[in-house]
């Protein structure tokens, strides 16, 4: 596993794309970001549309090595699910763990989503390990 303080490389061409995604985020991304930004989540610093390697993660906390992905309808096909699985495996090789939520979960049950993230962070704090 990589040191949590290590720098995670990203392809420089992704910087502009990530900025564009931040400027044109979905409603689900907006409402989750309102709960994560400014270290509101237990003092952890989350970033949105974070370039890592050759990909962009919806939300990322370096200290927790936690990626949060919001899956919209484009992720429902078997081909998309396989692509997401392979992508997640690549990130897990860097020691990054994932939480995935659907857009519907974010829109319809945001409190539960926040609780899942808090529980994940609590477990990390208590054990020093990622789930």
Tell where the protein language model's regions lie, with residue ranges.
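Basic, amphipathic alpha-helical patches used to engage nucleic acids or provide basic targeting signals
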Residues: 21, 48-124
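Solvent-exposed, charged helical/coil patches
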Residues: 1-43, 123-131
């Amino acid at each position: 596993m990589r040191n949590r303080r290590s720098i995670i490389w990203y392809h420089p061409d992704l910087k502009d794309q990530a900025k564009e995604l931040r400027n044109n985020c979905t409603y689900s991304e907006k409402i989750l970001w309102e709960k994560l930004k400014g270290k509101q989540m237990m003092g952890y610093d989350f970033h949105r549309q974070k370039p890592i390697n050759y990909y962009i993660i919806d939300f990322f906390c370096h200290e927790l090595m936690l990626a949060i992905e919001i899956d919209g309808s484009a992720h429902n096909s078997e081909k998309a699910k396989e692509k997401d699985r392979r992508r997640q495996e690549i990130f897990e090789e860097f020691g990054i763990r994932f939480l995935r939520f659907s857009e519907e979960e974010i829109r319809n049950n945001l409190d539960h989503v926040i609780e899942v993230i808090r529980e994940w962070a609590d477990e990390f704090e208590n054990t020093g390990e990622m789930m």
